[in-house]
């Protein structure tokens, strides 16, 4: 898959890539959920409405409003980030959008950068991760996010806990895609030759 990504990166202009990246970020956010006042899980946003109402702030910064009222500030940087100084583009972005949830997309970055962004209510991704939607891959199983009450039901039904459930690590692309937290449980549905579909669960560690 890497050669295809490289070809796409070469063939597309930066402005074209920004459009693709934003479309896939909005798709990702649309696949996330929030819990409403009744305790029910709802899609974080409607992708069509979110794209139509997205606000451009200049310098590849875009604001996306979620249906639960959260505001997401998205910053696309076409370079590798190796350090963050007080006067850096990243620091200025984090300071200006301190009260927002933040998504940064860059060519590459170090592990220390990832940790720093997480501590500032943000996520950072590599450019190639948003040149296609992760869940649109035909070989991906289906994933279902669970509400807190659904997680408790799984624990009760299967007599499960974080020690007995199968694990998925926080660095996994799926965990990052859904912004899952430690001890969250996700349902995985795969095709099965015997039962039509197989259902499994993973807990984030």
From Swiss-Prot:
Localisation per UniProt entry: Virion
Single GO MF annotation:
DNA binding
EC number(s) per entry: 2.7.7.6
Q: In which domain of life is the source organism classified?
A: Viruses
Q: Which Pfam families match?
A: RNA_pol_Rpb5_C
Q: Which UniProt keywords apply?
A: DNA-directed RNA polymerase, Nucleotidyltransferase, Transcription, Transferase, Virion
Q: Tell me a GO biological process for this protein.
A: transcription elongation by RNA polymerase I
Principal place of residence:
virion
| EC class (word) | transferase
Q: Which family does it belong to?
A: Belongs to the archaeal Rpo5/eukaryotic RPB5 RNA polymerase subunit family.
Role according to the record: DNA-dependent RNA polymerase catalyzes the transcription of DNA into RNA using the four ribonucleoside triphosphates as substrates.
- List the protein's name: DNA-directed RNA polymerase subunit 5
Q: Which organism is it from?
A: Acanthamoeba polyphaga mimivirus (APMV)
